[in-house]
C-alpha cells in the first residue's frame, strides 16, 4: 500500500502551488511621471517625440498587444492529466485501493482552433496599436498648428488693439481741435473696447490650445515659450483616387478586418467544441484480501446527445456576420470621410491662397488709404473704422481658413494612419 501511494504523494507535492514557478508581479502601484517640455520654443518634431514617448493611450495599446502573447501561450497548452485515488472498504484486511491517471485527449482540432483565435487577437491588437499611433500623431499635428494659429490671432488682436488705441487718440485730438464730432470719438472708444475684448478672447484661446497640446503627453501646465512653425506652407495631399488606394493599408481598415478574422476564428473554436474529448485512464488496483495487484485501463467519451455546443456555435456565427457588416460599414464611412476631407482640403487651400494674394493686400491698402486720408482730413472716421473692421475680419477669416486646411489634412492622415 505504501509503495502504491508514495509516487502519488510525490506527484501531488511537486504539482502544488508551492513548487510552481513564480511569476513577476508587474501590477505594483507607482506614481506616474509626467514629462515636461523645455521652456524655450517648441517644434513639431519635439512635440511628436514627447507624445510618442509619454502618451498613455499609446502605452495602453502597446500593453494590450503585449498581453496577447499570454493568450497565445495559453492556447498552446494541452490539458493537464488527472491523478485519482479510490479506496474500497475501510478494513485493512479487505481493503481495495486504486490509483490511476486520467489523460484527456482533445479531438476536433480544439488546440489549433484556440491558437488560431489567439493569433487573430494579436493581429487585432497590432492594428489597434497602429491606429492609436496614427491618431495620436494626427492629434499632435492638429493641436500644434492650432497653437500656431492661436499665436497669430493674438498677434493680430494685439495689432488691432494698438491701431484702435491710436485711432481713439487721434479722434480725441481732432475733437479737441473741433474738426470732427464728439460722436466720432465715442465710436472710436467703442471700437477700442471691442479690440481689447478680441485680444482677451484670443489670449484665452491660445492658452486653451497650449493646454490641449501638452495634455497629449500628460502635462497640464505648458512650459514652452511659443510654438515654432511655418503657417504659410499649406499642406497638400494626393488626389482622391490615390487616397482611396492608400485606404486599403489604413490601420483603421486593418483593425476592422482583423476583428472580422478574429470572429471567424472564434467560430472555428466553437465548432471544434462540438466534438467530445477522449479520456484515457491508466492505473493500478491493489486487492489486499487476495494479495494481488491488477492493472486498470479505461476509456471515457461523452455522448453528444443533448449538448452539442449548438447555442455557442450559433452565437459565434451571428457575431461573425455582425463583424462582416461592421467591416463593410466602416469601410464605407472611412471612404466617405476621406473624400470629404480631401474636398475640404482642396477648397480651404484655394480659399487661403485667394485671401493671401488678393483679399488681404486689398484690405490693407484700403485701411492705409483711409488712415492717411483721415489724418489729412479727406475722410471721416467712419471710413477708417470700416476699413479697419474689414482688414481685421479678413485676417481672422484667413486664420480660420488655415485652421480648416490643417484640420482637413490631419483628418486624412488620421484615416490613413500616417
From Swiss-Prot:
Regulation: induction: By zinc, cadmium and cobalt (zinc being the best and cobalt being the worst inducer).
Domain of life according to the entry: Bacteria
Official protein name in the record: Cobalt-zinc-cadmium resistance protein CzcC
Keyword Transport in record: yes
Entry's Gene Ontology BP terms: response to cadmium ion
InterPro entries: OMF (IPR050737), OMP_efflux (IPR003423)
Cellular component terms (Gene Ontology): cell outer membrane
First and last residue of the signal peptide: 1-22
Classification of source organism: Bacteria, Pseudomonadati, Pseudomonadota, Betaproteobacteria, Burkholderiales
Gene Ontology molecular function, alphabetical: efflux transmembrane transporter activity
Keywords linked to the UniProt accession: Cadmium resistance, Cell outer membrane, Cobalt, Membrane, Plasmid, Signal, Transmembrane, Transmembrane beta strand, Transport, Zinc
Similarity-based family: Belongs to the outer membrane factor (OMF) (TC 1.B.17) family.
Biotechnology note: In the presence of 2 mM Cd(2+) or 4-10 mM Zn(2+) up to 99% of the metal is removed from the culture supernatant and is sequestered via bioprecipitation. Additionally Cu(2+), Co(2+), Ni(2+), Pb(2+), Y(3+) and Ge(4+) can also be removed from culture supernatants, although it is not clear which efflux system is responsible for all these substrates.
Amino acid at each position: 500500500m505504501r509503495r502504491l501511494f508514495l509516487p502519488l504523494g510525490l506527484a501531488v507535492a511537486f504539482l502544488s502551488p508551492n513548487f510552481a514557478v513564480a511569476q513577476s508581479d508587474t501590477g505594483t502601484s507607482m506614481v506616474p511621471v509626467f514629462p515636461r517640455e523645455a521652456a524655450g520654443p517648441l517644434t513639431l518634431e519635439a512635440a511628436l517625440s514627447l507624445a510618442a514617448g509619454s502618451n498613455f493611450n499609446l502605452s495602453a495599446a502597446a500593453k494590450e498587444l503585449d498581453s496577447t502573447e499570454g493568450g497565445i501561450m495559453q492556447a498552446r497548452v494541452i490539458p493537464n492529466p488527472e491523478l485519482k485515488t479510490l479506496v474500497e472498504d475501510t478494513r485493512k484486511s479487505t481493503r481495495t485501493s486504486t490509483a490511476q491517471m486520467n489523460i484527456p485527449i482533445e479531438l476536433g482540432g480544439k488546440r489549433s482552433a484556440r491558437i488560431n483565435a489567439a493569433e487573430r487577437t494579436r493581429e487585432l491588437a497590432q492594428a489597434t496599436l497602429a491606429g492609436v499611433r496614427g491618431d495620436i500623431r494626427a492629434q499632435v499635428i492638429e493641436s500644434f498648428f492650432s497653437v500656431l494659429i492661436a499665436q497669430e490671432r493674438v498677434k493680430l488682436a494685439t495689432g488691432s488693439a494698438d491701431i484702435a488705441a491710436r485711432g481713439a487718440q487721434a479722434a480725441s485730438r481732432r475733437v479737441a481741435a473741433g474738426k470732427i464730432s464728439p460722436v466720432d470719438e465715442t465710436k472710436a472708444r467703442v471700437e477700442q473696447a471691442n479690440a481689447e475684448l478680441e485680444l482677451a478672447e484670443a489670449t484665452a484661446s491660445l492658452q486653451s490650445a497650449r493646454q490641449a497640446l501638452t495634455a497629449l503627453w500628460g502635462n497640464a501646465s505648458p512650459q514652452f515659450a511659443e510654438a515654432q512653425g511655418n503657417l504659410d506652407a499649406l499642406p497638400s495631399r494626393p488626389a482622391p483616387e490615390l487616397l482611396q488606394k492608400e485606404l486599403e493599408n489604413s490601420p483603421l481598415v486593418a483593425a476592422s478586418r482583423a476583428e472580422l478574422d478574429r470572429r471567424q476564428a472564434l467560430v472555428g473554436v466553437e465548432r471544434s467544441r462540438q466534438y467530445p474529448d477522449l479520456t484515457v485512464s491508466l492505473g493500478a488496483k491493489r486487492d489486499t484480501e487476495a494479495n494481488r495487484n491488477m492493472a486498470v485501463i479505461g476509456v471515457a467519451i461523452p455522448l453528444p446527445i443533448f449538448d452539442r455546443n449548438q447555442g455557442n456555435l450559433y452565437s459565434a456565427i451571428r457575431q461573425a456576420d455582425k463583424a462582416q457588416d461592421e467591416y463593410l460599414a466602416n469601410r464605407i464611412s472611412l471612404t466617405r470621410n476621406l473624400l470629404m476631407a480631401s474636398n475640404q482640403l482642396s477648397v480651404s487651400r484655394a480659399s487661403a491662397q485667394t485671401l493671401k494674394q488678393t483679399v488681404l493686400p486689398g484690405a490693407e491698402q484700403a485701411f492705409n488709404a483711409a488712415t492717411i486720408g483721415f489724418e489729412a482730413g479727406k475722410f471721416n472716421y467712419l471710413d477708417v473704422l470700416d476699413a479697419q473692421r474689414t482688414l481685421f475680419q479678413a485676417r481672422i477669416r484667413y486664420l480660420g481658413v488655415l485652421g480648416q486646411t490643417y484640420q482637413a489634412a490631419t483628418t486624412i492622415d488620421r484615416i490613413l494612419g500616417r
